[in-house]
């Protein structure tokens, strides 16, 4: 293994699946969101891309730090307990965290509190932003994200700062809140969280957003042509999300709550959600499910029943 390979593997191994539906992604493809929420969509395996993501996060932190040192705008990145400002809905299964809140961003209304949102972009994307109509027109996902933040924190405006990773150019804009976006996204998230099967894809299987931005493995799982690599509680037919906790899940096979570590590990009683198998069900017996694939029968059973 070369040094570059080791760098890449370190990034890949360091990934952790998100426990909730984040406001940064909730405006996106509902099928992909469902697969990610069920810990079934393959994680990135490209270390270089993961390093770019990490670099973007570091740049965004640096911008917040520079704003604090400038002193022109008052910045608060954490609450009184030193925690990042967060919001959550639907029993903790949907949520988000903001880069901070600011005052004095508008000289005409210096005491107004605004959301602070910092992004980074490569040169091509940055030029698209500069030449476009607005930040919200630039990215639907970012538009939904900032609208959800403003509504969740009951603020009317947000200060946007976008940093060009190629030449350090900076773009700023103040975005106005719009009614209804958060409510719409909460309803979307609720449908995803409650669903036992993935929502229909908004794209055809040959759409460029699938072919260009997904690996072959990701495409196969997205199109339900292949089972996920990861076996865990979230893609098991026995589990379900609980809405009266903090992102809680329950196993109906053992009639008990399951914590994050248990969810990630799974157990020998795992049975695939039938929607992920994506074959006609031929029969159910003793916890096992039999599927028909042409003339062949395929049985998905807990490990202790395998081969019986």
In which residue ranges do the predicted regions lie?
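Metal-dependent nuclease catalytic cores that hydrolyze phosphodiester bonds in DNA/RNA
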Residues: 1-115, 122-127, 133
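Soluble or luminal CAZymes and related metallo-dependent hydrolases
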Residues: 55-59, 141, 181
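Glutamine-centric residue-chemistry signal
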Residues: 84, 145-147
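Short, glycine/acidic-rich beta->alpha junctions
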Residues: 92-93, 138-143
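Residue-level recognition of conserved beta-strand positions in structured domain cores
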Residues: 102, 118-120, 162, 253
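Conserved active-site beta-strand-loop modules that form the wall/rim of enzyme catalytic pockets
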Residues: 111-118, 156-160
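Metal-dependent nuclease catalytic regions and adjoining charged, substrate-binding loops involved
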Residues: 128, 136-140, 148, 152-255, ...
């Amino acid at each position: 293994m070369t040094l570059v390979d080791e760098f890449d593997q370190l990034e890949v191994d360091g990934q952790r699946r998100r426990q909730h539906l984040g406001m940064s992604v909730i405006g996106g493809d509902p099928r992909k969101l469902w697969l990610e929420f069920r810990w079934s969509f393959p994680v990135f395996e490209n270390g270089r891309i993961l390093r770019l993501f990490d670099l973007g996060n570091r740049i965004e932190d640096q911008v917040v730090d520079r704003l604090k040192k400038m002193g022109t705008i008052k910045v608060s990145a954490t609450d009184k307990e030193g925690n990042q400002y967060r919001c959550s809905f639907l029993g903790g299964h949907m949520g988000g965290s903001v880069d901070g809140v600011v005052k004095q961003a508008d000289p005409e209304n210096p005491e107004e509190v605004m959301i602070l949102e910092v992004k980074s972009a490569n040169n091509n994307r940055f030029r698209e932003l500069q030449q476009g109509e607005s930040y919200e027109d630039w990215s639907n996902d970012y538009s939904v994200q900032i609208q959800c933040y403003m509504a969740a924190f009951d603020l009317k405006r947000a200060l946007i700062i976008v940093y060009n990773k190629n030449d350090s150019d900076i773009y700023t804009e103040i975005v106005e809140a719009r009614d209804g976006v958060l409510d719409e996204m909460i309803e979307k998230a609720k449908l995803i969280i409650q669903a036992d099967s993935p929502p229909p894809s908004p794209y055809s299987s040959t759409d460029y957003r699938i072919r260009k931005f997904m690996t072959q493995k990701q495409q196969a799982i997205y199109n339900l042509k292949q089972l996920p690599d990861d076996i865990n509680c979230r893609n098991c037919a026995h589990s379900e999300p609980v809405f009266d906790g903090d992102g809680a899940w329950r196993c109906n096979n053992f009639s008990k709550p399951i914590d994050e570590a248990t969810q990630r590990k799974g157990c020998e009683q795992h049975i695939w959600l039938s929607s992920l198998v994506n074959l006609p069900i031929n029969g159910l017996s003793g916890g096992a499910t039999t599927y028909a694939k042409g003339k062949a029968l395929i049985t998905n059973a807990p490990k202790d029943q395998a081969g019986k």
